[in-house]
Each structure stands twice: as C-alpha cells, then as structure tokens.
C-alpha cells in the first residue's frame, strides 16, 4: 500500500490506480510508473508544454520563450522549480534591458516578508502582463491569494496563465 504524506489526498491513489491500469493496457506491459520523480520534473513538464503551446503555429523558427513570469522569490518561500535557476531556466526569456531572466517576483508586505502585498502585485500584473503567474511555495505561512489574482487576470489582455503548484498544501486543500 502506498503512503501519502499529506492528509486528504487519498483520492490521488484512486486516480493513479486508474491511470496505471489504462497505461498497462495501452502499452501492453505489466508494470508502469506514472508519477513524476520530483517537483522540478513536474514543473519542467508544465513549462515545456507552455512553450510548445505558444509556438504551436510556427515550428520553423527557434521557439519563443515565455516573455514574463511572475512568481514567489525563493528567499520569500518560493519553490526552486519556479525560479530562473531551477526548472524555469530553459523556458523564460531574458529582459532585453537588464539581460536577466524576465521574472518579476510578487511584492511582499513591509512588516511581513512572507505575505504577498496583493494591491502591489495587481499593479505589477498590469505593468508586466506576465504570460505565466506561478503560485505555490515551499515555505507556507499564509494562503496564496488565488481568487484575487484570478479576478485581476481576467482583465488582462492577453490573459495570463495562472499556475498553482499546490504540492505542499494539497492535503490541506483536499
């Protein structure tokens, strides 16, 4: 029997079992492993799929990378996989002015460096119009303002993709 480290995630066992069963039939083999081996690998798959999607209409040129990404800074609890030195490295463009990765971090409150300053974040959304917004942290002290950001994203043109890597809080949500 599998051991799930987060409470409230037992349903994942059922989903994984169904997937394993279907993959065994599809591949015609007795054993398959359908789980990714790490958060880095999982987020690499997401970032790769996004770059593939934004380049779907032009396969002749060098693929365009994600123009701007907004995330939690690693020092403020952000996960390594969503950083330019992590899985995001090969999928984010460079800012033509600074020549650094085109990543803007969520601003935080002056009196609490681990809590997002939502009004300031909304202003940055309007300024940068990131293609991808990554929520989720390795160090969780406060809940992420998913609903507030989602409402603001609907007003952007083009609309940003909101990704919530909830691996560390899934058991609390589930």
Predicted regions located by residue number:
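Conserved PLP-enzyme active-site core in the AAT-like
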Residues: 11-14, 18-32, 37-174
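Phosphate-rich ligand and nucleic-acid binding surfaces
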Residues: 5
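N-terminal "arm"/small-domain region of PLP-dependent enzymes with the aminotransferase-like
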Residues: 1-2, 160
